[in-house]
């Protein structure tokens, strides 16, 4: 059993190395040579505001931004009625006429990668694609190698590149000057978390590690004030599903692996077909919805899991976009916007 656990751990680490190597060598964002600002005082005038707090749109409003922070949002009139100048904030260094436009907080994408050498070797394409869709903050899981990610995070914060704000979540064992070797035991896990925290990461991207290793990583991350998110892949979900990880203090589940397994009626792992191959993503994605036969909607286990995850303040980040595309491949493949926006290498 000891050697079997070591084999599974090595297999898991080898898979991560392959995935990471695909992101090694990607080009960082070019120095910013376009755009305006920042300004000491920016005023956006006459917009219809969606504030993100659950209320309906309202406007017209004038929004004042000072020192890169919103300092006031002022209602300046009513739809179809001329705006009185005495209701408006003082002039800014720069002003945007937003009449007829909507203003809302930027989206936060909780699961991103910066691309790969094979598919999107230049991060400029990825950054601008996110921004064009209104994504102004991203959590890289990981964005790329540790040093690359921290450099891009700092350059974005300094407005040196055209990119969203970046939060850096990294895999255990990363770091060019990390001398502790592979993270295979609790003691090494804690040492690496302390090392990575000093480097400046924001959190850990975890896998379905064996319980003692997972516990050490999460516990030390909490002590270092780091966040945690996990892809609980099926290669390890029998020993670490969502409720197991949540009880250890995990903050977020990314993807959907491990969630259904936490509320199976009569199984511990999914009943795979005889020709199942985990490395075939069509097999993996195609089997997801088949778990409905193993779960009882609104049943006792369903309700108990829901209540416990809520009590633990646990976050679910299911990343269903690619799965949804896989369920209707022809619609996704023939979308009108591919010709203009999709990088040709994405089709290779």
Residue ranges and their predicted role:
Residues 8-16:
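Bacterial N-terminal signal peptides
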Residues 88-160, 179, 184, 240-245:
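Metal-associated gating/positioning segment near the N- to mid-region
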Residues 46, 101, 108-115, 231, ...:
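Histidine-centered divalent metal-coordination motifs
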Residues 25-40, 49, 53-104:
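Histidine-rich, glycine-flanked metal-binding segment
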Residues 126-147, 163-173, 197-209, 218, ...:
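Divalent metal-dependent hydrolysis catalytic cores, especially in the metallo-beta-lactamase
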Residues 171-224, 251-252, 274-296:
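Active-site gating/metal-coordination segments in enzymes
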Residues 145-151, 208-220, 263-273:
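Active-site-adjacent beta->alpha loops and helix N-cap segments on the catalytic face
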Residues 195-202, 251, 259-348:
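Active-site neighborhoods of metal-dependent hydrolases
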